[in-house]
Amino acid sequence: MSCQAFTSADTFIPLNSDASATLPLIMHHSAAECLPVSNHATNVMSTATGLHYSVPSCHYGNQPSTYGVMAGSLTLVFYKFPDHTLSHGFPPIHQPLLAEDPTAADFKQELRRKSKLVEEPIDMDSPEIRELEKFANEFKVRRIKLGYTQTNVGEALAAVHGSEFSQTTICRFENLQLSFKNACKLKAILSKWLEEAEQVGALYNEKVGANERKRKRRTTISIAAKDALERHFGEQNKPSSQEIMRMAEELNLEKEVVRVWFCNRRQREKRVKTSLNQSLFSISKEHLECR
């Protein structure tokens, strides 16, 4: 229970309507004779300003004073306290007792945590760095082996992932000039692209190799078989399909081989005849000029 001491004469005016008809009550007392200040009295004052009670007086230490509750009675009296007594007020509420929005508190904690979060330096001898360097070198070698340029790779990735990929991006990755975070992201993309490019290259090489094997495949015809084919050509230079099949069975050759031989033989015969005709025409022309 706290007390408010009055060191000077204080004037108390009752709040009833008859206050103007009575003289103000003067109270003189020392610091030892102080009035108790309670929250209950303050609350009563703020809620019952419309009530009017008489002002009973009592004596304390042979000095007249006025109290809110008279001894032996429950009659309440409301006063107008001096201004200097109201200026003291109550102590401020302690900050931790104030309620705070949990959402705002969580946001502040998260913001504080992120502001204190500092990226740890990367160890250049770590396994991740060595693995990244190894992949960059392997990627460059395999890219060149497949026949792709840095521009080809950048355009292929830009068509799928966006315009942030270019020849400069691939060049910086192969030279390890990107940040570790960006290089790790690009490594996954380039690894997938390289796998797909090698699959396409394998299919292309297989197809080209098969075509080359077909073109380079040659059949050796024996001298006896050539003589027999020459005799048949002298008899019939354009044999039918049945005759070609019969000759192939007799000479132990494939039907396609016999057919191609007759085609080539007719072309050679045509070139020989053309050459002979040109030679005869030239000789005749020279003979006429000499005359």
Curated annotation (Swiss-Prot):
One of its GO terms (molecular function) is RNA polymerase II cis-regulatory region sequence-specific DNA binding. A motif (9aaTAD) lies at residues 5-13. Residues 214-273 bind DNA. GO terms for biological process: positive regulation of transcription by RNA polymerase II; regulation of transcription by RNA polymerase II. Residues 124-198 form the POU-specific domain. Belongs to the POU transcription factor family. Class-1 subfamily. The 9aaTAD motif is a transactivation domain present in a large number of yeast and animal transcription factors. Transcription factor involved in the specification of the lactotrope, somatotrope, and thyrotrope phenotypes in the developing anterior pituitary. Activates growth hormone and prolactin genes. Specifically binds to the consensus sequence 5'-TAAAT-3'. Interacts with PITX1. Interacts with LHX3. Interacts with ELK1. This is Pituitary-specific positive transcription factor 1. It comes from Macaca mulatta (Rhesus macaque).
